[in-house]
Amino acid sequence: TYGSAYEPAPVTPVADNFFYSAAGGNQSLVTRIWEMIGYLVAPDIMAKKFFLLQGPSNTGKSVLGRFIQNIFPKGQVTGLSLSQLGDANLPAEFMGSRLNLSMDLSNNKTDPKAIERIKLLTGNDLISQNIKYKDNRSYNGQCKFLFSTNHPIRLKQWDDAFFQRIVCIPFYNVISQEHKDTKLLDKLLSEKDGIVSKALFYYQELKKRNYLFEGQDK
């Protein structure tokens, strides 16, 4: 337990302030951000979820995305869009990826093929083994997915199961140019070890709740 003499809570004032500001002071949403980071880092795909940072420009989405990207080794991060994930075969660079990060989803309606693919890729079931790379090797099912958009999600065909896979992190607190901290990413990276440690604590609590993210319906 954090706060004991044996395991003090990591000190992460920059992250704490950033998450609080990005969430507009909504503590439930702050908790969800911590849970998201913890789950993305943990070697666990049981939640069957992917993550969406959603809201206007200049709200901190890209800074958070770049910070999360920097947690992982470069060779374990890919940048395939939803439409690219819907292609017949996964590209070779996806092999070994632990995080797929696409930070600028368009306002176009998403094709049903891409919807089905992301459901399979986050499904943690045997059917994902039918997803192939171009050299016919099977997908190993270890990648997590983080997307960001300034727009509402639009589908060519409604799909309840797709929306049930999304853990949305809304960003609505627009920061003006004069108040923007251009060194924020560097400051967050200086706290990286503490942020990851704290996020993994939230992840352990998430597991105890059977992967019910803060603020989600049961």
Residues of each region from the PLM?
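Feature primarily recognizes SF3-like P-loop helicase cores of small DNA viruses
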Residues: 1-59, 63-218
